[in-house]
Amino acid sequence: MLYPIEFDVIVVGGGHAGTEAALAAARMGCQTLLLTHNIETLGQMSCNPSIGGIGKGHLVKEVDALGGAMAIATDEGGIQFRILNSSKGPAVRATRAQADRVLYKAAIRHRLENQPNLMLFQQAVEDLVVEGDRVIGAVTQVGVQFRARAVVLTAGTFLDGKIHVGLNNYTGGRAGDPAAVSLSARLKELKLPQGRLKTGTPPRIDGRSIDFSVLEEQPGDLDPVPVFSFMGRADMHPRQVPCWVTHTNERTHDIIRAGLDRSPMYTGVIEGVGPRYCPSIEDKIHRFASKDSHQIFLEPEGLATNEFYPNGVSTSLPFDVQLDLIHSMRGLENAHILRPGYAIEYDYFDPRGLKASLESKAISGLFFAGQINGTTGYEEAAAQGLLAGINAGLQVQGKDAWTPRRDQAYLGVLVDDLITRGVTEPYRMFTSRAEFRLSLREDNADMRLTEVGRTLGVVDDARWDAFNRKRDAVSRETERLKSTWVNPATLPLEDAEPVLGKGIEREYALADLLRRPNVTYETLVGMQGGKYALESPLAEDPLLAEQIREQVEIGIKYHGYIARQADEVERLGANENTRLPADFDYSQVRGLSIEVQQKLAKHKPETIGQASRISGITPAAVSLLLVHLKKGVLRGQVGPRASSEGEAA
């Protein structure tokens, strides 16, 4: 049956990538259909009940700055919030939240069901409709055919998924959900480059069987309580609860070692490569054999359940081994396992087969986002989904694609890494992956992206008004500190010494004093009984006031470093966005080695910047490309430059 309505965009999959993709396309005014095998699992947190972390929190803030749902849903469902690396520099500080699974999922579903231009339909997709080299629709398991001008595929771990517990295995997309076997077979017919990856999850524990009296309590941050969304407030949060800490020990490790002969990872049953930075407990014990203990965090799954997630013991060992290793840890001697841990193998597609827009190079109108591209994590998936949804919408509207630059967003770093370098293991975001991380902080994600999002059509009026209010307030406050002067007469020794450590000997602007290492915005404006405090209308909005204080202090204290980084971006970006024609014949470039020619022909980079980051492409090869392009421009054969990938169409 052909469904009577033709859509602009179809999104296949209702996880973190799919929900952001569908919401983004719909916000842009595209008639959008989200197809999911089960409406009840929209936005489900398949593994750990947390959002954010180092690098990941930055992505969540960027998704939020572009109007996405993940951050605000976390504020509505988060039951513990912490700022990681709070004692370090602003570039690496990151927000992390424990989320109530039920509340988070409800917040996502509420937004999906109330988003104009978005329809939901519960049916697994078994086929794509492809005419020539273009996708035109999708077919569900009961034969309903939906037509669309663009399709976003966000199948997560479901493509030919296989679940492993010990040497037993069965097909599944995750525990309790079927694998997408037919869709996987159909995609194989399209001859897209693909491989197998693996991830895993720990057993879940009944909190009633945990002895909390012998465990270390880990509370969240309380003063102030962090929020994730730029539109969020602490009073949105439900009741806050602690996490708990235990440790593995030598007995735990002996139990694991004794069970390795029945581990699917160590007997060759699992072929897929697992995530390096979220290894299974058996992998930890094997790789770090000299370490006699590993920290394990017991994380609550929600306020209305006794279920706990033991973060750090992801495993695919047989259930009897899982039971013994859990019981070997302090506080868990009598723990009851509610759900066994397992590993899952699944198909992924080589992201080097994608354009920077996340559209397939082989099939027009087909976009890929999330774990299907070889990434791991909710946050990486959500960011890709948002971008794929935006670019699907732009294509439908006849506009140029948009992708943020590496110096503009962690999302830009993520996509550029994927499409130029590919993956050999599940890709996880870290702040260390970004060259320009001092400029890519959590606190300024809105300053970097919200204006672009407004141009793209994904930022609504409420967010736009709030952003402008904040931007204007930060600018005014920065100028106030630069133009407010003090001298020994107006700031006597008894007032200066507690804040500055000594008196001042001449006239200074407040901004100059703020640059001193031990001076904070709060202590500076609190001098002389708050004489220099923030103007009262802003101070009465605690969230806005805190955002202003943070932005102003970072902007003034790190001005020199940020300016130098901006100069570096400009210098390096001179040729970053120089376009390479899609039909470029690299064999015609004099001086390029056969190896380099083959790599460039295989990867088909869209820009000089992308070409430079392909493994094995040397600076000398890039120079030869630039010389060849320049000659072509002089002969009128190629265009010199395209508009910046980092600017909205």
Swiss-Prot record:
Task: Provide the primary localization.
Answer: cytoplasm
Q: Does the keyword tRNA processing apply?
A: yes
Q: Does the keyword Cytoplasm apply?
A: yes
Identify the domain of life: Bacteria
One function term, GO molecular function aspect: flavin adenine dinucleotide binding
One GO biological process this protein is involved in is: tRNA methylation
Q: Where in the cell is it found?
A: Cytoplasm
Q: Keywords of this protein's UniProt record, alphabetized?
A: Cytoplasm, FAD, Flavoprotein, NAD, tRNA processing
Q: Which GO terms describe its cellular component?
A: cytosol
Report the record's disulfide bonds: none
Q: Name one Pfam family in it.
A: GIDA_C_1st
The entry marks the following residues as binding FAD, namely 13-18
Binding positions for NAD(+) per the UniProt entry: 274-288
Q: What NCBIfam families does UniProt report for this protein, alphabetically?
A: mnmG_gidA
Assembly mode: Homodimer. Heterotetramer of two MnmE and two MnmG subunits.
Write out the similarity annotation: Belongs to the MnmG family.
Q: What does this protein do?
A: NAD-binding protein involved in the addition of a carboxymethylaminomethyl (cmnm) group at the wobble position (U34) of certain tRNAs, forming tRNA-cmnm(5)s(2)U34.
The name under which this protein is listed is: tRNA uridine 5-carboxymethylaminomethyl modification enzyme MnmG
Q: Which organism is it from?
A: Ralstonia pickettii (strain 12J)
What gene does this protein come from?
mnmG
